[in-house]
Regions:
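Short, Lys/Arg-rich, polar N-terminal cytosolic tail immediately upstream
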Residues: 1-12
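Hydrophobic transmembrane alpha-helices
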Residues: 13-67, 71-75, 79-82
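Alpha-helical membrane-inserting segments
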Residues: 27-35, 52, 123, 147, ...
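Generic transmembrane alpha-helix motif of multi-pass integral membrane proteins
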Residues: 45-56, 64-71, 88-95, 105-110, ...
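Cytoplasmic-side transmembrane-helix entry/capping segments in multi-pass membrane proteins
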Residues: 63-70, 80-84, 99-111, 138-139, ...
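Interfacial aromatic-anchored transmembrane helix boundaries in multi-pass membrane proteins
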Residues: 69-98, 111-112, 149-156
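Generic multipass alpha-helical transmembrane bundles of integral membrane proteins
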Residues: 110-246
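Short, highly charged, low-complexity non-transmembrane loops/tails of multi-pass membrane proteins
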Residues: 257-276
Length: 276
């Protein structure tokens, strides 16, 4: 019997209220410190304000955090700022019902240097339904690629050169969107891994609270999906992330759900073989 984790409800409520302030502060702090517009010493103050607004009101903090990058991006290219503004409004609408989970994609650039982007489907669980989980994961992985491109690093998961993001001075939104899309999808392997992880995030709900069988099924699914997406990807980090996810899913607290009929029949067959 695998032990289940018990969570103190009071601490859970406090954490649920305060935790979203961290990604808001990280998004605003990194944007204002990296992209030229605000004075250098303003970054910490604006990041703190984003965190404070998020604690006071999740939607207020989300709106502020998503709005701050518009000015630095407009300083680089007007078209880019317009494209981002449209995307930010769509993102705000998508997560209107779950504002505390709207900025989970910020975890992408944090997991990438650790070789742990394979854990993103697990991170995205808090986003809600399959569509939101897939969106968070896809944007998180793409954001990790953008950060790598700005920093002159290599693409996460697949390796290789990061995208060239030389889009300064573009005034037309359509041109800016096309240029950015071409840069992000220039590596087919990276795009396939992004889709694979997004698909795993969409499917993770089916494995939750089903005990070790659910965890094992998801671990196997994630392993196969990510390794088949790019045969040249580094296997050990992806496999480790898959089975760490499997272990955490296996001990997830909550009311257990019955296994699907396929798995129940598989267990019966395995027991018969073992006893024969």
């Amino acid at each position: 019997m695998i032990p289940r984790i018990r969570i103190n409800r009071a601490w859970h409520r406090r954490g649920k209220r305060v935790a979203p302030a961290l990604p808001a502060a990280l998004l605003v702090g990194w944007t204002t410190a990296t992209l030229p517009f605000f004075p250098a010493h303003w970054s910490a103050g604006i990041a703190f304000l984003a965190a404070l607004l998020t604690v006071v009101g999740p939607r207020l903090g989300l709106a502020f955090a998503l709005a701050v990058p518009v000015l630095p991006l407009g300083n680089i290219a007007l078209g880019l700022a317009i494209v981002y503004g449209i995307a930010a409004c769509a993102w705000f609408a998508l997560f209107w019902a779950r504002p505390r989970a709207a900025l989970l994609f910020v975890a992408g650039p944090l997991l990438a240097p650790l070789g742990a982007l394979g854990l993103f489907p697990l991170v995205a669980v808090a986003a809600g339904g399959p569509g939101r989980r897939a969106a968070q994961t896809a944007v998180g992985v793409l954001t990790a690629g953008i950060v790598a491109g700005i920093g002159g690093g290599t693409l996460p998961v697949t390796g290789g050169a990061a995208p060239n993001l030389a889009i300064g001075g573009i005034a037309a939104p359509a041109t800016a969107a096309s240029t950015l899309w071409d840069a992000l999808t220039g590596s087919q392997a990276f795009l396939l891994e992004t889709l694979a992880l997004a698909g795993a995030a969409a499917a993770i709900g089916a494995a939750r609270r089903r005990g070790p069988w659910g965890g094992a099924a998801f671990g196997a699914f994630l392993t196969v999906l990510t390794l088949f997406a790019d045969a040249g990807a580094s296997a050990p980090p992806l496999v480790l992330a898959a089975w760490l996810s499997a272990a955490l899913i296996a001990v997830e607290p909550g009311i257990p759900r019955p296994l699907p009929e396929f798995f129940r029949r598989s267990r019966v067959r395995l027991r018969l073989v073992h006893g024969s």
